Swiss-Prot record:
Main localization (coarse): membrane
GO cellular component: basolateral plasma membrane; cytoplasmic microtubule; plasma membrane
Species in which this protein is naturally found: Rattus norvegicus
Tissue: In the brain, expressed in the central amygdala, hippocampus, area postrema, nucleus of the tractus solitary and cerebellum.
Side of membrane Extracellular, spans: 26-141, 196-216, 277-291, 357-367
Region Disordered, residue ranges: 425-449
Listed name of the protein: Secretin receptor
Primary gene name: Sctr
Classification via PROSITE patterns: G_PROTEIN_RECEP_F2_1 (PS00649), G_PROTEIN_RECEP_F2_2 (PS00650), G_PROTEIN_RECEP_F2_3 (PS50227), G_PROTEIN_RECEP_F2_4 (PS50261)
Amino acid sequence: MLSTMRPRLSLLLLRLLLLTKAAHTVGVPPRLCDVRRVLLEERAHCLQQLSKEKKGALGPETASGCEGLWDNMSCWPSSAPARTVEVQCPKFLLMLSNKNGSLFRNCTQDGWSETFPRPDLACGVNINNSFNERRHAYLLKLKVMYTVGYSSSLAMLLVALSILCSFRRLHCTRNYIHMHLFVSFILRALSNFIKDAVLFSSDDVTYCDAHKVGCKLVMIFFQYCIMANYAWLLVEGLYLHTLLAISFFSERKYLQAFVLLGWGSPAIFVALWAITRHFLENTGCWDINANASVWWVIRGPVILSILINFIFFINILRILMRKLRTQETRGSETNHYKRLAKSTLLLIPLFGIHYIVFAFSPEDAMEVQLFFELALGSFQGLVVAVLYCFLNGEVQLEVQKKWRQWHLQEFPLRPVAFNNSFSNATNGPTHSTKASTEQSRSIPRASII
């Protein structure tokens, strides 16, 4: 029985590890090393009790019966023959199921019998459940998806950020905000990789104890990166809304305020969360959020920022529709607003509106929530990089110009041929740099994305 239970327990702990990696919501299972720590503590306590039994004077019936036993799960005291011994479910199984039950062994002339009923069933942990098998496979696929998503997003964001930083003609307020947004997505991807490496690189119990301070610092950094990313998405929505709603708007004047909102406000809330967590829920590595009131210190501002962005989205659509219907609007400006509407419609749904949908979702919708938050959310940076940089007409024409200059320097006698269709096809959210510069003098709100 013990030989068959050990691989089952290993499989159970593996699933527990995957569950912990996938979710950061209230009520998720404990970490694998926490379970193993409890198991080793129970073992040490049991061996101490059995040692006391051996040193003490055992009765004649007990001496001729079954000797005390630690079976790698439960502690069985010494017993007289022909008796049934009852013990409670192991604590590490209670951590997984919260179901209290009893286990039994018979003391026979040949020694201890097998444990009955099966510990996993008696304690509410059904290892052979087909639902657990499906969930295990689902979480493995989910891990692959969000790893690929964050990796591809990180690569594309680094390229996009280097492009915007390299060309001085692209340096303007809107692109400065875009670059800050790119950095926030880069930090979000890196923080996920660092968190996984720190939390799950080792399952040894001593690792959990020795790296508690560093582990908590990693979680503080992780939470800050998540909040900063949502804050810069809010800044993007606020910037678009302000440009459309206010007639005279000094972009450079408010850039410092945007930077303070994007990087400063998350630091305040994360600091409050860390202080609250230290005094009210200073357990583990701060990766399990069992206290809902503490978790709302971070969760509340994130949901509020998404709600505000959604309001901006509705109002931006209202303003755009009103401007497009105005007969006095010139044709060139109408084209600009159409491109703006297209870019806005592509951008605003990426602000995390799905987070509100699943913020109060029931437990049976957890897998769908994890899919949207981890799998699809990990590709968010990739989509934003494509929308803000690679599909931007100004960026494309600057890259084309740089390529022409390099080609003329390397091959001065070979003409450079560019199809006119390239400029027409790639003229994304904005016109060329020269055209947009000239038009921006008369239409300051034309090129926003």
